[in-house]
UniProtKB/Swiss-Prot annotation:
This is Glycogen synthase. It comes from the Bacteria. The gene is glgA. HAMAP family: Glycogen_synth. Keywords: Glycogen biosynthesis, Glycosyltransferase, Transferase. Synthesizes alpha-1,4-glucan chains using ADP-glucose. The lineage of its organism: Bacteria, Thermotogati, Deinococcota, Deinococci, Thermales. One of its GO terms (biological process) is glycogen biosynthetic process.
Amino acid sequence: MRVLHVAPEAYPLAKVGGLADVVGALPKALRPLGVEAHVLLPWHGGLEARRVGEVAFAFFGREERAPLGERVEGGVRFLLLGVEGFGRERVYGYPDDAERYLRFALAAKEVARGYDLVHAHDWTAALLALYAPTVYTIHNLAHQGLVDPGLFFSWTGLPWSLFHMEALEFYGRVNLMKGGIVFARRVTTVSPSYAEEIQTPEFGMGLDGVLRRHAGKLRGILNGLDTEVFDPGKDPYLPAPYTREDPSGKARAKEAFRERTGLRPPVLAYVGRLDYQKGLDLVLKALPRLLEMGFRLYVQGVGDGGLQEAFLRAEEENPEGVRFLPAYDEAMARLAYAGAEAVLVPSRFEPCGLVQMIASRYGTPPVARAVGGLKDTVEDGRGGVLFETYHPEGLLYGVLRLFRLGAEEMGLRAMEKDFSWEGPARAYREVYREALG
């Protein structure tokens, strides 16, 4: 079985969030199961690859051509499409993102002709479901890909007959994610709990009715973790290796983390995108109380400008209690996972989340909100702590409960959990077989 993963990002070539980790790791896990899976990405600025051909495709009623590159990483074949608009620094965040990714998808459908099945990821690849046998994965329902219908049908050449409530229309606009849900043969999302939540008005982002209508082909498959990449026993970013059986090297990581940050323990760490979805408003509101109780806070990430300003200000006002790194720095992220006393994952909603898995693997217990994939991955009271209420008091309660139960012991128990891709890969192979009938 030959499967083409089509996505905007994949580790280690381009990474913004957890989607990249999934797309980079799943093909490796599928290989032993007899699935030959390749990954197709846009040729983002700065990516090096060997040019292997050219792809002709139609856009806005005329033929365009895009160079096709190839690169092998970790045994996975990555294909890069050099369509117009992608020789830039960032993966997302440009005013013409809809046009860029529609152009990419139209070129991708030509590459997909050589495969049995397309596995399309999020709104950027959703258009493929209208052209090829597709499994469509929703990584985050909040980003749906809304496009002006006049532009959409001019760019793609698709018929206006698709612009109705049972197909692409969504409150007067084209919704690419809705198209993926409607036209894909199978739809997955990244945890069982999130698959249930998105069928409700609270979490459905306006698509809960569509998802309920297509519930028969919807399945929640928990993301795995690339346990070769995230392994404290051989992590090159750590000062010393350690395992659950011999955790002595973790003390070296804590010492190095303290030296790099200047924060004395206990340190609570947040590593990830600066986004209100991630519950960072709770962290800011709870911060004065946390500092009063003797905790320190380490925050690392980029994203929302208002949140970035708030954490810069918090560091200025509390130089001994807060450290903020507004950057993507993998070395410091690994050191935080290993060296902090706990990680905070207080999300408003969370499709799956990888931070809590990585931290658990590194023996650092998470304090997480009981939503989505966090419920499916954090064993409350054993490998971490869950809290229900989206309120600063809920977060404070979770932190205090963790340390009352014993954060260090809970971290060691968290290391027992199997987050590998072996089980999820088998589940995806079954979904592929169903999609191909």
